[in-house]
Amino acid sequence: MSVSQNKLCKRLRRLVGKAIDDYQMIADGDRIMVCLSGGKDSYALLDILLALQKSAPIHFEIIAVNLNQKFPNFPERVLPDYLEKLGVKYDIIEHDTYQVVMEKIPAGKTMCSLCSRLRRGILYRYAEEHGITKIALGHHKIDVIETFFLNLFFTGRLKAMPAKLLSDNKKQIVIRPLVYCDEKDIVKYAKLKAFPIIPSNLCGVQKNMQRTIIKEMLLAWEKDYPQRIEHIFAALTKTVPSHLLDTELFNFAEIEQKAIRFCEESD
C-alpha cells in the first residue's frame, strides 16, 4: 500500500470514528445492522466499521444484511461469496418488491419512492425481529448536501439528512457513520479494496433527475469555487435559529421580555 493509500484509509477511519463519537452512534452491546446494497458506499461502511470494531474500547456486533428485491439480472452470489470470504456474519433477505412495484406503478412513472418505502419497511421489520439496536446506512457528506438542496429547491424546507435519527415507527435508530466522508475518497477506497460492485440500475429506472441536477450543480461549484462544499456542510452544523424565520425553532415573542429584563438588570 502506498503512502497516499495509507493516508486515505486512516482519514476515512478517523472521520467515521469522529462521526460515531460526535453523534454517539454506537454504544456498548449494540447489534449493528449494516445495510449492504452492493454499492461502493455500503461496502466502504462495512469495511471501515469492521476495522474500527477491532480496536474499539467497547463491544458491538456487526451483521451485514442485503435485501434481494429480485431485480432482473441481479447477481445473487456476489454478496454471499464476498461476505463468506470476509468471514462476517450476514443475512440475505429475499423479497420480490420489484414485481410489487411494477404492478402498482404505471409505465413511464418513477417507482423509486414506492420501492424505497417497501425496502425501508422490510429492513425495519427485520431489525425488530432480530434484536437489532442500530441500522447503519452508507450515506456520505455529498448525500447530505444533495438532500439539503433537494428539500430547499423542491419542497421549501430547510432539511437535510440526519447523522442519527429515530425511525418513524419509533422502534429503530438509524445511523450514518460516513456522514463526514467525501464521496471522492470513498470512490478511491472502493477501487483500492476492489469491492465487487453491483450495478445500481438493474431495476431499469432512470436516475432521479432532480438529484442529478443538484449533483451537477455541486460538481460545478466544487470546480469553480473550491471549499464551497465544505462551507455548506459546515453551515449545517452551525444553525442560528434566531436568524431564521421558523417560529417553531425560536420564540420571537420572548425578545421584548428579554430586553426588559436586561434593562432592569442594568439599572
Swiss-Prot record:
Keyword terms: 4Fe-4S, ATP-binding, Cytoplasm, Iron, Iron-sulfur, Magnesium, Metal-binding, Nucleotide-binding, RNA-binding, Transferase, tRNA processing, tRNA-binding
Entry's localization field: Cytoplasm
Cellular component aspect of the GO annotation: cytoplasm
Origin superkingdom: Bacteria
Reactions that this protein is recorded to catalyse: cytidine(32) in tRNA + S-sulfanyl-L-cysteinyl-[cysteine desulfurase] + AH2 + ATP = 2-thiocytidine(32) in tRNA + L-cysteinyl-[cysteine desulfurase] + A + AMP + diphosphate + H(+)
CDD domains the UniProt entry points to: TtcA-like (cd24138)
Record's cofactor remark: Binds 1 [4Fe-4S] cluster per subunit. The cluster is chelated by three Cys residues, the fourth Fe has a free coordination site that may bind a sulfur atom transferred from the persulfide of IscS.
Enzyme class: transferase
Gene Ontology BP, a term: tRNA thio-modification
EC number, UniProt record: 2.8.1.-
Stated family: Belongs to the TtcA family.
Other facts: The thiolation reaction likely consists of two steps: a first activation step by ATP to form an adenylated intermediate of the target base of tRNA, and a second nucleophilic substitution step of the sulfur (S) atom supplied by the hydrosulfide attached to the Fe-S cluster.
Biological function: Catalyzes the ATP-dependent 2-thiolation of cytidine in position 32 of tRNA, to form 2-thiocytidine (s(2)C32). The sulfur atoms are provided by the cysteine/cysteine desulfurase (IscS) system.
Name of the protein: tRNA-cytidine(32) 2-sulfurtransferase
Organism: Dichelobacter nodosus (strain VCS1703A)
Upper lineage: Bacteria, Pseudomonadati, Pseudomonadota, Gammaproteobacteria, Cardiobacteriales
